[in-house]
């Protein structure tokens, strides 16, 4: 062992385990690349990103902290979102919430809407899980 060395288990890291997921289709209609970070309130993402914003209210990307998803001009891809946890307050970003999340606006997936939600993590099929690309 080397002084200061950290030895960890060689296992997969589970991100946002037991958080219900919502999958939405996103298209960059702008002329420049757009990146959205792991903790950004997706509802408030760049206006050039076209998607069902109401389904994104109160949610962020289901990716590891510090990662991001990049949308090149014209890109269209599915992303997986999860609800914020903790105190459920959102401040900053584009200033559209600045306080408590309005629970009545939060889309919660159910079995009757298979296009908006998945029961289990989509793993490698999920665009956001591919190294932030």
Curated annotation (Swiss-Prot):
Q: Where in the cell is it found?
A: Cytoplasm
Name of the featured protein: Urease subunit beta
- Quote the gene name from the UniProt entry: ureB
Please list the reactions this protein catalyses.
Answer: urea + 2 H2O + H(+) = hydrogencarbonate + 2 NH4(+)
PANTHER family, sorted? UREASE
Report the CDD domains cross-referenced here.
Urease_beta
Organism taxonomic ancestry: Bacteria, Bacillati, Bacillota, Bacilli, Bacillales
What does the record give under GO molecular function?
Answer: urease activity
Organism in which the protein naturally occurs:
Staphylococcus epidermidis (strain ATCC 35984 / DSM 28319 / BCRC 17069 / CCUG 31568 / BM 3577 / RP62A)
Taken from the UniProt entry, a GO cellular component term is:
urease complex
